[in-house]
């Protein structure tokens, strides 16, 4: 995974693990990571995925309708090491 990636943030660690497994079953490269400080919400864990898989992630989101979803974010590591995080608006009904 590179310096540009997606983050799915949840309120429940159980949902983080379930969504990560659903992504992997669908062929999406995903991993559980600490939630970036800029999101500052949820259970402290999130699912990281490649932005190239954004469409597949949206399909898994629609198919599984995960509970406790806070939102999807686009993260970018700046040259100085800072992490910039912005809402993506993948989730159905999400207005980020």
Regions found by a protein language model. Give the residues of each.
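Amphipathic, hydrophobic secondary-structure cores in small proteins
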Residues: 4-7, 11-60, 65
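C-terminal structural segments of small proteins and small subunits
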Residues: 58-96
